[in-house]
């Protein structure tokens, strides 16, 4: 870290980049809500050890990869159930919140924190066509806004909540989660 800083390279430490420890996966991985709490404990250690030298932190890199790993099987752990993807998504958002709480508790005056969310905004093929506009809106709600709405608005969109309820993919959402 010191050598990076000497070379005028700003370190940005990512706490989770698709590399969940094997033993945590054996305990259910991101389907286990406790992993979010343990992530917060891990974040506390990272901030204590590196907070005075690292100016930028990212809690999670591309949380959609977790959804894809649990719902589509394209990444680890290779599961293929949408309800698993929604639960993993919710729990990784909880982990982000735990990480941010640990960061705030560490009171790091010269550092910042965030999350890396893929934003592939869908635009209607025909902006004057109501059906195209509606499709683009739904696609956005189901992709990047499924992360940004909980983080910045403190809730999932009504559309996404209704869709998860209708499809039986609603994760366990407790008071205080958002």
Residue ranges and their predicted role:
Residues 2-178:
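Active-site region of glycoside hydrolase catalytic domains
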């Amino acid at each position: 870290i010191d050598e990076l800083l000497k070379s005028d390279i700003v370190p940005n430490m990512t706490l989770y980049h698709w590399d969940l420890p094997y033993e945590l996966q054996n305990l259910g991985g991101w389907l286990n809500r406790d992993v979010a709490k343990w992530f917060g404990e891990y974040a506390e250690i990272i901030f204590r050890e590196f907070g005075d030298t690292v100016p930028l932190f990212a809690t999670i890199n591309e949380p959609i990869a977790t959804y894809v790993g649990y719902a589509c099987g394209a990444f680890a752990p290779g599961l293929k159930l949408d309800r698993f993807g929604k639960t993993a998504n919710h729990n990784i958002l909880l982990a982000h919140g735990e990480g941010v709480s640990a960061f705030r508790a560490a009171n790091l005056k010269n550092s910042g924190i965030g999350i890396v969310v893929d934003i592939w905004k869908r635009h209607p093929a025909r902006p004057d066509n109501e059906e195209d506009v509606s499709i683009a809106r739904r696609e956005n709600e189901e992709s990047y806004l499924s992360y940004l709405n909980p983080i910045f608005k403190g809730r999932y969109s009504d559309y996404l909540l209704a869709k998860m309820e209708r499809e039986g993919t609603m994760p366990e959402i407790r008071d205080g989660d958002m």
